[in-house]
Amino acid sequence: MNIAVVGLSHKTAPVEVREKLSVPEDGLEGAIAQLCSYPHIEEVAILSTCNRLEIYIVTSETESGIREVTQFLSEWSHLPLRELRQHLFILLHQDAVMHLMRVAAGLDSLVIGEGQILSQVKNTHKLGQQYNGIGTILNRLFKQAITAGKRVRTETSIGTGAVSISSAAVELAQLKTPCLADCRVAVLGAGKMSRLVVQHLLAKGANQIAILNRSTERARELANQFSEASLQIHSLAELFNVITRYDLIFTGTSATEPLLDRSKLEPVLEVNQSLMIIDIAVPRNVHANVNELEQVQVFNVDDLKAVVAQNQESRRAMAMEAEALLEEELTAFDVWWRSLETVPTISSLRDKIETIREQELEKALSRLGSEFAEKHQEVIEALTRGIVNKILHDPMVQLRAQQDRETRRRAMQSLQMLFNLPVNDSVVNVNS
């Protein structure tokens, strides 16, 4: 078996490509089922955020497994393989393991050290288990990566003062407008990113804010979190009736098709109205053709890079400190991974010893007579199990702990010879 990740991110693909490959949460179950149906994919997990789409697999045949994932991505995005491949990255085993740990720690994010990605990795793990994509190996990998992400945040100061996508969007608005306090602002969506946008807008002095959402109840729940502010609530269905009231719009909904395009906006905008739209959704909530309207300025997540760059240099030293912690977690995972090679031999030895124990116990109980056997069977059973477990404990621990591959294999061969164990050809391949 081997671990691989196939994906793309803000580093390899622009937003117009990333949005085509985005897998919404309600599409995860079907996507995981489709990937698991391929003959060379044993386990799968899908990490889909506004800045990345990454598919982690355990595969019995690395080249074939990667080809199956690439084919899936082409079908999902309706992009030809030739176009898609130029944006993809592929990492194998230790590189794939370290990549997920760096992602969970926020070191691979557009905003170094941002905290939201760790909760997204946790959600990927939870849903991967729920939809039967994650098995023994990816379960261990994601747990180790989540531990790594937590350690980086608690043992370094990389997360202190880190900007997020939402705060960078507000920062961009502040750079582009004379005074946020004078702006009439609309926030489309009521999810976590929208909550952070509202939070940062209020911190920057904005005081004329409306929340528009399909569910006004959810919009009201969001507004209630900022009870000190007078936030207006509208249904998203009212958008084109009220849009002329606003100078600045933030969009962050989970809609899979654009909410705003030129044909919808042009008829409702007033002649002298200037409008700025900052779209932090992926897929984008704002169609590219809105840029054709002279009085409208549109920015998307890729336009935040310049804002974020100002925050990054001070974090690079912290990132180096974090990398050392990740190396420790990588080693811990690698020790576990390599110990999988010993599982068939250990299982065979346990099965053989257990068979002998049961046979000898049965003989002993029959000699002791039925009355004694019935009275003391549980005690004798526990005694023999305890003896067997204690005898096997040290050899098994030592075998698993052997990090040198050849030493470990020689030890397994010795056990197989000494105990006349079957040689198992299905030993897990732990080649890096």
Curated annotation (Swiss-Prot):
Where do the annotations place NADP(+) binding?
Answer: G189, A190, G191, K192, M193, S194
Q: Which domain of life is it from?
A: Bacteria
| GO terms of molecular function | glutamyl-tRNA reductase activity; NADP binding
Q: Reaction catalysed by this chain?
A: (S)-4-amino-5-oxopentanoate + tRNA(Glu) + NADP(+) = L-glutamyl-tRNA(Glu) + NADPH + H(+)
**Any idea which UniProt keywords this protein has?**
Chlorophyll biosynthesis, NADP, Oxidoreductase, Porphyrin biosynthesis
Q: In which pathway does it act?
A: Porphyrin-containing compound metabolism; protoporphyrin-IX biosynthesis; 5-aminolevulinate from L-glutamyl-tRNA(Glu): step 1/2; Porphyrin-containing compound metabolism; chlorophyll biosynthesis
What does UniProt list as catalytic?
C50
State the EC number(s).
1.2.1.70
Q: Which residues bind substrate?
A: T49, C50, N51, R52, S109, E114, G115, Q116, Q120
Q: NADP: present as a keyword of the record? A: yes
A biological process (GO) of this protein is:
protoporphyrinogen IX biosynthetic process
| Residues under site feature: Important for activity | H99
List other remarks: During catalysis, the active site Cys acts as a nucleophile attacking the alpha-carbonyl group of tRNA-bound glutamate with the formation of a thioester intermediate between enzyme and glutamate, and the concomitant release of tRNA(Glu). The thioester intermediate is finally reduced by direct hydride transfer from NADPH, to form the product GSA.
Q: How does it assemble?
A: Homodimer.
Listed PANTHER family = GLUTAMYL-TRNA REDUCTASE 1, CHLOROPLASTIC
Q: What does this protein do?
A: Catalyzes the NADPH-dependent reduction of glutamyl-tRNA(Glu) to glutamate 1-semialdehyde (GSA).
Q: Which family does it belong to?
A: Belongs to the glutamyl-tRNA reductase family.
Name this polypeptide is given: Glutamyl-tRNA reductase
Q: Which organism is it from?
A: Cyanothece sp. (strain PCC 7425 / ATCC 29141)
